[in-house]
Curated annotation (Swiss-Prot):
Family: Belongs to the UvrC family.
An example molecular function term from Gene Ontology annotations: DNA binding
Keywords linked to the UniProt accession: Cytoplasm, DNA damage, DNA excision, DNA repair, Excision nuclease, SOS response
Classification via SUPFAM superfamilies: C-terminal UvrC-binding domain of UvrB (SSF46600), GIY-YIG endonuclease (SSF82771), RuvA domain 2-like (SSF47781)
Entry-linked InterPro entries: GIY-YIG_endonuc, GIY-YIG_endonuc_sf, GIY-YIG_UvrC_Cho, Hlx-hairpin-Hlx_DNA-bd_motif, RuvA_2-like, UVR_dom, UVR_dom_sf, UvrABC_protein_C
Localization per Swiss-Prot or TrEMBL: Cytoplasm
PANTHER family for the chain: UVRABC SYSTEM PROTEIN C, UVRC/OXIDOREDUCTASE
Family matches, as CDD domains: GIY-YIG_UvrC_Cho
Keyword Metal-binding attached: no
Biased composition (Acidic residues): 14-23
Domain UVR positions: 255-290
Stated name of the protein: UvrABC system protein C
NCBIfam families named among the record's database cross-references: PRK00558.1-5, uvrC
Organismal lineage: Bacteria, Pseudomonadati, Pseudomonadota, Alphaproteobacteria, Hyphomicrobiales
Length: 681
């Protein structure tokens, strides 16, 4: 949650982006993806006993294909999925690959690598399109257009399962009863909005368990961020009116809400109740603050996503703006992985199908240019959403102005990305030259530990590559070993490295370093699982420990390990570097490679500290009831409502526990025994 939890239970939301929201989520696991499609009736058509490949294989495969719609997959010799495609007629579409016509380099290479194919039929072409998009996202084939940085979008949730609804930031499935508003482009946008809504409507942000056990108002009530429904500082009717106003504001009726508050402010002034008038004035200012961050709020666009693409220099940027209830909920730039030779319209077409694979579809989608399968895409998304979806390219009026604005944003983001990518390529090349690497690294892993006297110890791993930091590859390691003494950084690093590379060996096997791809080939390959270089925050002692681990695992020749020791007085710019085959050395103070390494080390430090703080915070707020098997949120809430605190629960007798709603004799005895070692009554 992007906010600061106060000691007495309320939450103050801040306005920064929650950068690590998805950093600890593993990238889509290939085995899991395979299981998700294993239930489909995939048909290999025929048994390739003669070892055919390429055009010869496809030509034979076509003979066994039906004329019906469906999806096909192409595999290489190693069993990796090269491409997933869909067709109105499988026979005609796949047959195109086997004809002698001139293909693009990308298609020719894909055909040449193909050693096996499978297909599955669908009832309609729209079904085929949706299945294709789903498979591409999960299998991430090398030759498809791939959506990257596919983080879920945050929403604002106003709950409806309590007498006093609360307001929260929400991601994921909509399991909880309530009203959801969004999507917002970032956690920062949600934080800003909730922060202002707290000031404007005084809605609580505490959890239900805190709310039910309050005996006096919390700090948020004192600073006028909450109306205090927990202790009835506001009547239920008055609080319900505040919640209604908040919902109306988020539903697009902002002007009506502001007019009503302004009227109340004027009435208070006329009654010479200036203190109450000041409260209404502050509420109006908070609402204006929300709208000032929304930029354009077009009156003619009620619910729409607006997409624009700029394709140049081998990089595509797709910018999307979200409009809901006539309000702009923010924007985000995407840089899909695609063949540079593909036209922008084809990239945008493939992007849209994948984008909406797991996201709610609005009633209207506006594009900067026409895509090939516009009607089919609209029909497929409408079928998925359960309502009509229109996809159009505006030619005039307000919608055209909005689309042009989104396109201008796409061009600006594209220019920034192009500059960053060019700079990153130069830095990686300089890094390789500085450390005498045989090739430019594509994946660098940086490790750091964080703890306080050995408690809540966490190891952090961040990843950098040709396009900067790759946050969906970040990992945290909660130190589990009980043999590590407080402050034993060597022991912590040993555990982290052993766990990391043991799992990598199990899942990926050893990398083949004999076949290093050229820069051109590397650009077409998926991001590698194995690091080319690991950076360790430490000197000779840390490096000795790391080398010993790599030797034990038999991967010393697979990974280049480099130690980065802080300079005298821990001064930046005076770092010493430790690498195999050479004496330790320093870099000139203004060397770009030195700044690059410092930035990577600082990011690892930030991530490790953030993970440690999150673990420590979780430990501090842990409830003793959480440790009892069979006590879920519902029973815990009932116990706390009945007894007031967890300490009172621990002192309760067996008969007292049995009087609580939802607590049977068996569960009561389990709770009692947990807090009393003797287990007797």
């Amino acid at each position: 949650m992007n906010g600061k939890k106060l000691p007495d239970g309320g939450i103050l939301f801040d306005e920064t982006d929650d950068e690590d929201d998805d950093a600890n989520l593993a990238a889509t696991d290939t085995a899991e993806a395979s299981r998700s499609v294993a239930g489909m009736d995939w048909n290999a058509g025929w048994k390739n006993e003669s070892g055919l490949k390429g055009m010869d294989l496809i030509g034979e495969f076509v003979k066994h294909l039906p004329n019906s719609p469906g999806v096909y997959r192409m595999f290489n010799e190693a069993g990796d999925v090269l491409y997933v495609g869909k067709a109105r007629s499988l026979k005609k579409r796949v047959g195109n690959y086997a004809q002698g016509r001139v293909h693009s380099n990308r298609i020719a290479q894909m055909v040449r690598f193909t050693t096996h194919m499978e297909f599955v039929t669908t009832r309609t072409e729209t079904e085929a399109l949706l299945l294709e998009a789903n498979l591409i996202k999960r299998l991430r084939p090398r030759f498809n257009v791939l959506l990257r940085d596919d983080k879920s979008f945050p929403y604002i949730l106003i709950t409806a399962d309590n007498r006093a609804p609360a307001i929260f930031k929400h991601r994921g499935a909509r399991a909880r009863k309530g009203d959801y508003f969004g999507p917002f482009a970032s956690a920062g946008a949600v934080g800003r909005t909730i922060n202002s809504l707290q000031r404007a409507f005084l809605i609580r942000t505490c959890t239900d368990s805190v709310f039910e056990t309050r005996t006096r108002p919390c700090l948020l009530y004192q600073i006028k961020r909450c109306s205090g429904p927990c202790t009835h500082e506001v009547s239920d009717e008055g609080y319900a009116e505040l919640v209604k106003e908040a919902k109306d504001f988020l539903s697009g009726k902002s002007q009506a809400v502001k007019t009503a508050i302004a009227r109340q402010m004027n009435e208070a002034s006329e009654d010479l109740d200036f203190e109450r008038a000041a409260i209404y004035r502050d509420r109006l200012a908070a609402l204006s603050h929300v709208q000032s961050h929304q930029g354009i709020n077009p009156a003619g666009i009620e619910e729409a996503d607006v997409f624009a693409i700029h394709h140049e220099g081998g990089i595509s940027c797709i910018q999307v703006f979200f409009f809901r209830t006539g309000q702009n909920w923010g924007n985000r730039a995407y840089f899909p992985k695609a063949d540079p030779s593909l036209p922008g319209s084809e990239i945008l077409n493939a992007f849209l199908a994948q984008f909406y694979d797991d996201k709610p579809v609005p009633k209207q989608i506006l594009l900067s240019e026409t895509v090939e399968e516009q009607e089919l895409l609209a029909a497929a998304l409408g079928e998925k959403a359960g309502h009509k979806v229109t996809i159009s390219v505006p030619q005039r009026g307000e919608k055209k102005d909005i689309t042009d604005h989104v396109l201008a944003n796409a061009r600006e983001a594209h220019g920034r990305k192009l500059a960053e990518t060019s700079s990153q390529a130069r830095l990686l090349k300089g890094f390789a030259e500085t450390f005498n690497l045989p090739y430019v690294p594509r994946r660098i892993e940086i490790y750091d530990n964080s703890h306080i006297m050995g408690t809540n110890a966490v190891g952090g791993m961040v990843v950098a590559g040709p396009e900067g930091f790759v946050k969906n590859q970040y990992r945290k390691f909660n130190i589990k070993s009980t043999d590590i003494t407080p402050g034993d950084d060597f022991g912590m690093m040993r555990e982290v490295m052993t766990r990391r590379f043991s799992r990598l060996l199990k899942e990926e096997g050893k990398p083949d370093r004999a076949q290093t791809p050229t820069p051109e080939e590397a650009a077409d390959l998926p991001f590698p699982a194995w690091p080319d270089v690991i950076l360790i925050d430490g000197g000779q002692g840390q490096m000795t420990a790391v080398r010993a681990i790599l030797d034990e695992l038999g991967i010393r020749d697979c990974v280049t390990a480099i130690g980065v020791a802080k300079g005298v007085d821990r001064e930046a710019g005076r770092e010493r570097f430790f690498a195999d085959g050479r004496s330790d050395f320093s870099l000139p103070p203004r060397d770009p490679v030195l700044y690059f390494i410092q930035r990577m080390r600082d990011e690892a430090h930030r991530f490790a500290i953030g993970s440690h703080r999150a673990r420590r915070k979780k430990e501090m707020v842990r409830n003793p009831l959480d440790e009892i098997s069979g006590i879920g949120p519902g029973r815990k809430r009932s116990l706390l409502q009945h007894f007031g605190t967890a300490k009172a629960v621990s002192r309760a007798g067996l008969n007292d526990l049995m009087t609580v709603t939802g607590i049977s004799e068996t569960v009561a005895r389990q709770i009692y025994n947990h807090f009393h070692e003797s287990g007797s009554d």
